[in-house]
Swiss-Prot record:
Name the UniProt record assigns to this protein: Protein RESISTANCE TO POWDERY MILDEW 8.2
Name of encoding gene: RPW8.2
Species this chain originates from: Arabidopsis thaliana
Alphabetic keyword roster: Coiled coil, Hypersensitive response, Membrane, Plant defense, Transmembrane, Transmembrane helix
Keyword Transport: no
Coiled coil: 68-145
Length: 174
């Protein structure tokens, strides 16, 4: 799946580079392996979203989608350098290992947050745009095809002879 993402766009390429860096770092570092497993699971879970974001950004040249792409790409590039620096540390350098572990955890949380929030905001914007288009289509259809009118008249008096219910169907065939 990562190979398909890399063929996609700039985000896909950055995501595949990060995925490869995480694989290499897992082989080198024993102390941060569990965090890297979690990061790899996060990458696997957001891969379909990144594919969608890449696909939609190619179709629509929108300034907001470009901003989202740029932020995600920078975040992924920073993560690649962070993971690679973590993998290069020696075992004895415990203080830096813990700092990198904390930074990788923060990155994972930030990545999930950015993807969740940006995707939700973009979905809300798309829904709003879709509602406006549907309203426009509805008004055009109302102009083309007038709706029939139903009238219901109910008359009731206390006397026995004045009870009546009348239904009228009117169509505007002008």
């Amino acid at each position: 799946m990562i190979a398909e993402v890399a063929a996609g766009g700039a985000l896909g390429l950055a995501l595949s580079v990060l995925h490869e860096a995480v694989k290499r770092a897992k082989d080198r570092s024993v102390t941060t392996r569990f965090i890297l497993h979690r990061l790899e699971a996060t990458i696997d879970s957001i891969t379909p979203l990144v594919v969608q974001i890449d696909k939609f950004s190619e179709e629509m040249e929108d300034s907001t989608s470009r901003k989202v792409n740029k932020r995600l790409k920078l975040l992924l590039e920073n993560a690649v350098s962070l993971v690679e620096e973590n993998a290069e540390l020696r075992r004895r350098n415990v203080r830096k290992k813990f700092r990198y572990m904390r930074d990788i955890k923060e990155f994972e949380a930030k990545l999930r947050w950015v993807v969740d929030v940006d995707v939700q905001v973009n979905q809300l914007a798309d829904i709003k745009e879709l509602k406006a288009k549907m309203s426009e289509i509805s008004t055009k259809l109302d102009k083309i095809m007038p709706q029939p009118k139903f009238e219901i008249h109910i008359g009731w008096c206390s006397g026995k002879t004045n009870r009546a219910i009348r239904f009228t169907f009117c169509s505007d065939d002008s």
